[in-house]
Curated annotation (Swiss-Prot):
NCBIfam families given in the database record: PRK00283.1 (NF001399), recomb_XerD (TIGR02225)
Domain of life: Bacteria
Keyword Magnesium annotated: no
Role description: Site-specific tyrosine recombinase, which acts by catalyzing the cutting and rejoining of the recombining DNA molecules. The XerC-XerD complex is essential to convert dimers of the bacterial chromosome into monomers to permit their segregation at cell division. It also contributes to the segregational stability of plasmids.
Name listed for the protein in its UniProt record: Tyrosine recombinase XerD
Subunit: Forms a cyclic heterotetrameric complex composed of two molecules of XerC and two molecules of XerD.
Gene3D superfamilies reported for this sequence: 1.10.150.130, Intergrase catalytic core
Organism phylogeny: Bacteria, Pseudomonadati, Pseudomonadota, Alphaproteobacteria, Rickettsiales
Length: 311
């Protein structure tokens, strides 16, 4: 545990990773150590063969290849750290090939389904409904990560640090790895936020919070609505609108934002910047979605063999 604590401190100090990323590293490392303990293997006397057995163990527990790859990468980084600190001279993961897997195309909502959600939320004039309407409009208009959305501060989106400020249509957020990027939102999102700001005090009073810096304050430990709570609210909207709750989540709204931009003719590099992807290959998944969309559209072409027969 001592080495793990040192490694996590290094990640926090040098790589500026988010709390969620640090927790993910910690879980992977603790799971790995539990495995080693069960096998009576010392982490400082481990072999590449031991690592291969561990990977086989993970696969036998039906862990997805993507998750196995993440765990392997975590352990590889951990041993690189141990070497740099002179705790060991050997990285047993160095020559391990990552399992191959097929990228699944992300689920997206159609534009009509998005409209259905927004229309439903716009009719709920309770404080909770007005807040949810603002959050969904903002998420779909911007493609923010859910962690970025819920932790927005008044100063991020308003011209001054009070709820009386003007809502910016263009503002900046700090994304993964503390990388700043520009966010642009539409008029509908702006109007929904303005309406929400009129009743925001309801949530401040409800939370009995003295921390007024967050756009969406709550009684949660962090001072703002949790990602989990927002996801639950989205599921309830799906049920009320007749949509599959499994197909309505913050991340699916982000996917839908990107896919709809591409369908509308936006440049892939622009979408990459808006999403905050470090690598364009991550964004290219949406081109496959767009291709599938075009293929389905072509099924309705009059010369398609399934719908039109030449005499």
């Amino acid at each position: 545990m001592e080495f793990i604590a040192q490694f996590l401190e290094m990640l926090l100090a040098e790589r500026a990773l988010s709390k969620n990323s640090i927790l993910s590293y910690k879980r992977d490392l603790l799971d790995f150590q539990h495995y080693l303990a069960a096998q009576k293997i010392s982490e400082l006397n481990i072999t590449t063969g031991n690592i291969r057995k561990w990977i086989e163990y993970l696969a036998s527990n039906n862990l997805h290849a993507r998750s196995i790859n993440r765990k392997i990468s975590t352990i590889k980084s951990y041993y690189a750290f141990l070497i740099s600190e002179n705790h060991t001279k050997f990285n047993p993961v160095l020559n391990i090939d990552l399992p191959k897997y097929q990228n699944k195309l992300p689920i997206i909502l159609s534009i009509d389904q998005i409209k259905l959600i927004l229309e439903y939320c716009s009719k709920d004039n309770t404080p909770e409904g007005i807040r949810l309407n603002a959050m969904i409009n903002l998420l779909y208009a911007s493609g923010l990560r859910v962690s970025e959305l819920v932790s927005l501060k008044l100063a991020d989106i308003l011209t001054n640090n009070t709820s009386k400020g003007t809502v910016r249509k263009i503002f900046s957020v700090l994304g993964k790895g503390n990388k700043e990027r520009v966010i642009v939102i539409n008029d509908q999102a702006v109007l929904s936020i303005i309406k929400y700001l009129e009743i925001r005090d309801f949530f401040i009073n409800k939370a009995k919070s003295k921390n007024l810096i967050y756009l969406f304050p709550s009684s949660a430990v962090a001072g703002y609505m949790t990602r989990q709570n927002f996801a639950i609210l989205l599921k309830s909207v799906a049920l009320y609108t007749g949509l599959n709750p499994e197909h309505v989540s913050p991340h699916i709204l982000r996917h839908s934002f990107a896919s709809h931009l591409l369908e509308g003719g936006a440049d892939l590099r622009v979408i990459q910047e808006l999403l905050g992807h470090a690598d364009i290959s991550t964004t290219q998944i949406y081109t496959h979605l767009h291709t599938n969309h075009l293929k389905k559209a072509l099924l309705h072409h009059p010369l398609n063999k399934n719908s039109f027969i030449l005499s």
